[in-house]
């Protein structure tokens, strides 16, 4: 019985490359000269934006998002938190990277498959959802339904088996 897995993963190598490009641009750009604006990675591989003002922090975040988009990293995989005041009158913002398919998102995918009326079965398996059906055409229709479902998380299809 043909099947595939629906997962939510970010290409961490591309995230690292985009992070380095954004950091380099912030260090070299004229409007950031003389400011304490910087990007850092924390121990959980999330991104921390540090800046002297809210406007600079937003601009630095925009540079990071621009570089991520150019490298093909889906921006739905980012979860920017609120700006927090930091020491010395500066601000910092944590940008969490969404990894793995959360339980509620997996349940929404299963519900979407049931609502679609396709002859497929969906089963939650940890941080993935396995979709199986009798025909390849049903699985391709399921992929299309998931893509157009508007779930708000970056999804990939893996392990397509016959």
From Swiss-Prot:
Pfam families: DUF520. GO terms for molecular function: nucleotide binding. Keywords: Nucleotide-binding. GO terms for cellular component: cytosol. InterPro entries: DUF520, UPF0234-like_C, UPF0234_N, YajQ-like_sf. SUPFAM superfamilies: YajQ-like. The keyword Nucleotide-binding applies. Belongs to the YajQ family. Nucleotide-binding protein. This is Nucleotide-binding protein Anae109_0095. It comes from Anaeromyxobacter sp. (strain Fw109-5). The lineage of its organism: Bacteria, Pseudomonadati, Myxococcota, Myxococcia, Myxococcales.
């Amino acid at each position: 019985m043909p099947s595939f897995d629906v997962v939510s993963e970010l290409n961490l190598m591309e995230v690292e490359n985009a992070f380095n490009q954004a950091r380099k641009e912030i260090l070299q750009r004229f409007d950031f000269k003389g400011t304490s604006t910087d990007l850092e990675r924390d121990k959980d591989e999330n991104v921390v934006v540090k800046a002297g003002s809210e406007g600079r922090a937003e601009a630095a975040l925009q540079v990071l998002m621009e570089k991520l988009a150019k490298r093909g990293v889906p921006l739905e995989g980012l979860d920017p938190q609120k700006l927090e005041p930091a020491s010395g009158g500066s601000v910092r913002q944590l940008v969490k990277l969404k990894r793995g398919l959360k339980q509620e998102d997996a349940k929404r995918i299963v519900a979407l498959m049931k609502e679609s009326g396709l002859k497929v079965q969906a089963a939650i398996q940890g941080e993935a959802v396995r979709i199986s059906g009798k025909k390849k055409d049903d699985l391709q229709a399921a992929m299309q339904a998931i893509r157009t479902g508007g779930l708000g998380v970056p999804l990939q299809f893996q392990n397509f088996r016959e």
